A protein has these predicted regions:
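Acidic, glycine-rich flexible loop/linker segments
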Residues: 2-150
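Conserved alpha/beta-domain cores
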Residues: 113-430
Length: 430
C-alpha cells in the first residue's frame, strides 16, 4: 500500500490486495481490483484480487455472498469512486479501509491469523469460552469452515441447495446434499435451517408468488403451507431424519415471530425427527426477540438473525441501496436492544447464538461479548480473524466497552468510544 492512501473506505473483509482497476463484474482475474456495485455481484465471473464496492448494502444477501469468497474488500461511496478510473493501479487494505494508487509497489502480505484446529476451544484473554460457528451454503463452505477452526456449523442455508436443472428437490436430493455437507463438516456438529426464501434467493423451481420473500411479506415458516414448498419441507425433514442416526444435527425454524408459530412448526418437525435432534427458533423480528424468554421455554435454542432484525429495528430493507445508511451497526440503540435481550434471557443466554454480518463489522464483536453473548455464527473466512480478536481481548475490557456504548447517544459517539475513524465509515444519515 502507498504511504498516503487517496481514499478511506469502510473495512469489510480483511487482507491486502493490489491490481488494475476493473469496472465490470465479468472476466475478473487475480490481476484485478473489481470496482462494482452490489447489483453486479450476481454477475461476477472469475475472482479478482480485491473488491471495491460502491454504494454498498453491507447486510444484503448479495454482500453475504461476497463475504463467502474471503477476498479483501473495502466499501466506498459513489463520490469516492469518481476518483478511480478503469485500468488504474490500485492497492486496498480490507482491515483499515485504505485505498491507494502506486504502480510500482505490490500489496504487502497482510498478517496471517493464527491457524486453529476444527472445534478447538477458543477463550478470551482472561479465559472466557466463546464459540465461533460458521454460516454456510454448500459442502465446500462447510469444509472451509472446519479448516478455519470453526466450533461447528451454526447455520446451513438450505435454500441454496437446489438441483442444477431447476427441478423441485426431493428427499433423495436432500439426502445426498445434506450428507455431503455433513461429511465435509465432520467432526463438527451442524445446524440446518429449513428452507428460508427471500426476494433475491428464490429457486428456479418456485412459481411466482406475490410478496414472496419481501421484508414484510411471505418468508420463513409463513410459506410452509404453500405448494410446492410444503412438500419440499417434508422432504428436507425426511432426509435429516435418516442422517441423524450417524451425524450430529440440529434443526432451525426460520422467521418465527410468535410462540404459537414456534409450537406449531416445532410439533410438525418433532413428529418427523428423532428425539436426538434439537429444534431451535430463528428470531429475526422485534416481536420475536422481545419474547425471547417464552421462545426459550419451548425451543431447545434460539438463533437471532441480526441482518433481518436490524432491518426491522431501522425499518429499512437491507437489500435496498437507497436505504443502506439507515442500517447502522454502530447505533447505540441497537446495542441497548441486545442488552435488553440478554437481560431477559438471563442464565439461558448460553442457548442463544447471534447470526449474520453484525459481529463481523469492525469493532462490534467485543461489544457483543461485553453484553454477554458467547455464540456467533459467521461467514467461514472471518473465523480466523475473529478468533484472534477474541483471544487478544479480556472480558472485563469488553464489558466496559459495552457499558460505554450503551450510554452513548449517537453513532459518532460510538465510533469515538471504539476508536474508529468516522472517515472510514458511511455517514449513516447522509
Amino acid at each position: 500500500m502507498p504511504s498516503e492512501p487517496i481514499l478511506h473506505g469502510m473495512p469489510y473483509f480483511p487482507g491486502r490486495a493490489a491490481g488494475r482497476l476493473h469496472t465490470r463484474p465479468d472476466s475478473l482475474t487475480g490481476q484485478h481490483i473489481a470496482l462494482i456495485t452490489p447489483g453486479d455481484i450476481r454477475h461476477i465471473t472469475g475472482l479478482p484480487a480485491g473488491f471495491l464496492i460502491v454504494e454498498p448494502t453491507p447486510f444484503s444477501h448479495a454482500m453475504i455472498t461476497l463475504l463467502g469468497l474471503g477476498i479483501p474488500t473495502v466499501l466506498i461511496e459513489a463520490g469516492q469512486a469518481q476518483a478511480l478510473q478503469t485500468g488504474m493501479p490500485v492497492g486496498i487494505d480490507g482491515m483499515t479501509g485504505e485505498i491507494g494508487i502506486n504502480a510500482g509497489i505490490p500489496a504487502r502480505h497482510a498478517p496471517s491469523p493464527q491457524q486453529r484446529r476444527p472445534g478447538a476451544r477458543l477463550n478470551t484473554a482472561d479465559g472466557t469460552r466463546v464459540r465461533l460457528l460458521a454460516s454456510v451454503r454448500s459442502a465446500a463452505a462447510a469444509g472451509q469452515a472446519a479448516a478455519a477452526g470453526a466450533s461447528g456449523i451454526g447455520l446451513v442455508r438450505s435454500e441454496f441447495l437446489s438441483p442444477q436443472d431447476g427441478t423441485i428437490p426431493d428427499a433423495d436430493f436432500y439426502r445426498r446434499s445434506f450428507r455431503d455437507l455433513l461429511d465435509a463438516a465432520a467432526p463438527l456438529p451442524v445446524t440446518v435451517r429449513l428452507l428460508d426464501l427471500a426476494a433475491d434467493k428464490l429457486p428456479a423451481w418456485l412459481p411466482p408468488t406475490p410478496r414472496l420473500g419481501e421484508p414484510l411479506g411471505l418468508q420463513g415458516v409463513r410459506l410452509y403451507h404453500a405448494h410446492p414448498i410444503q412438500q419440499v419441507i417434508q422432504d428436507q425433514l425426511t432426509a435429516l431424519a435418516e442422517l441423524a442416526d450417524t451425524h450430529a444435527i440440529r434443526l432451525l425454524l426460520p422467521f418465527i415471530v410468535r410462540l404459537e408459530e414456534l409450537q406449531c412448526w416445532q410439533a410438525m418437525a418433532r413428529r418427523r425427527l428423532p428425539d436426538s435432534v434439537r429444534i431451535g427458533a430463528m428470531a429475526e423480528t422485534l416481536a420475536a426477540v422481545l419474547d425471547i424468554p417464552h421462545l426459550l421455554d419451548s425451543a431447545d435454542f434460539v438463533a437471532i438473525g441480526c441482518n433481518d432484525l436490524m432491518q426491522a429495528v431501522f425499518s429499512a430493507d437491507r437489500d435496498e441501496p437507497v436505504l443502506r445508511h439507515y442500517l447502522d451497526p454502530y447505533a447505540p440503540v441497537l446495542f441497548r436492544l441486545f442488552r435488553q435481550i440478554a437481560a431477559s434471557a438471563g442464565e439461558r443466554l448460553e442457548r442463544i447464538q447471534l447470526c449474520g454480518v453484525l459481529a463481523q463489522i469492525q469493532g462490534v464483536l467485543p461489544v457483543l461479548l461485553g453484553l454477554g453473548y458467547r455464540n456467533f455464527s459467521v461467514d467461514a473466512p472471518f473465523i480466523p480473524y475473529l478468533a484472534d480478536t477474541i483471544a487478544g481481548i479480556s472480558l472485563s475490557d469488553c464489558e466496559a466497552l459495552a457499558a460505554d456504548i450503551c450510554t452513548a447517544r449517537t453513532t459518532q459517539q460510538s465510533l469515538e468510544i471504539l476508536q474508529l475513524d468516522s472517515q472510514r465509515h458511511p455517514p449513516y444519515l447522509a
